Amino acid sequence: MKGMIFLAAAILSEVFGSTMLKLSEGFSAPLPAAGVIIGFAASFTFLSFSLKTLPLSAAYATWAGTGTALTAAIGHFIFQEPFNLKTLIGLTLIIGGVFLLNSKRTEAADQKAQLTIEI
């Protein structure tokens, strides 16, 4: 549970950093530029904490996929960036991949539990 909380914080920090990157105007706006550095530093710190209890493949896929989806939503709703069928299909594939990677982790845990019970 603690790992998932750190992962959620990593995702939100990464989305914050990405949003500030857009607002930093090529790092020429000091406050958003500082937000980029703080956001990404916090994101990698929280991600590393989450990896103490979560598998790398599942945590990284969740972090990257969810961050991508949220950043695309912010781009569309805040910055009026285009959102079309190709974008929707791409995001659906990314999110589907995250679910598949996480289901692999669940299946492995179930198999391990069954082996433990059988022995």
Curated annotation (Swiss-Prot):
A cellular-component GO term for this protein: plasma membrane
Keywords recorded for this protein, A-Z: Cell membrane, Membrane, Transmembrane, Transmembrane helix, Transport
Recorded superkingdom: Bacteria
Listed GO MF terms: transmembrane transporter activity
InterPro entries in UniProt: Small_drug/metabolite_transptr (IPR000390), Small_multidrug_res (IPR045324)
Signal peptide: none
Membrane topology: Multi-pass membrane protein
Cellular localization per UniProt: Cell membrane
Transmembrane segments: 3-23, 31-51, 59-79, 81-101
Gene3D superfamilies linked to this entry: 1.10.3730.20
Keyword hit for Isomerase: no
Keyword RNA-binding: no
Free-text function comment from the UniProt entry: Part of a multidrug efflux pump. Confers resistance to cationic lipophilic dyes such as ethidium bromide, acriflavine, pyronine Y and safranin O. The efflux is probably coupled to an influx of protons.
Subunit structure: The efflux pump is composed of EbrA and EbrB.
Family label: Belongs to the drug/metabolite transporter (DMT) superfamily. Small multidrug resistance (SMR) (TC 2.A.7.1) family. EbrA/EbrB subfamily.
Protein name per the record: Multidrug resistance protein EbrB
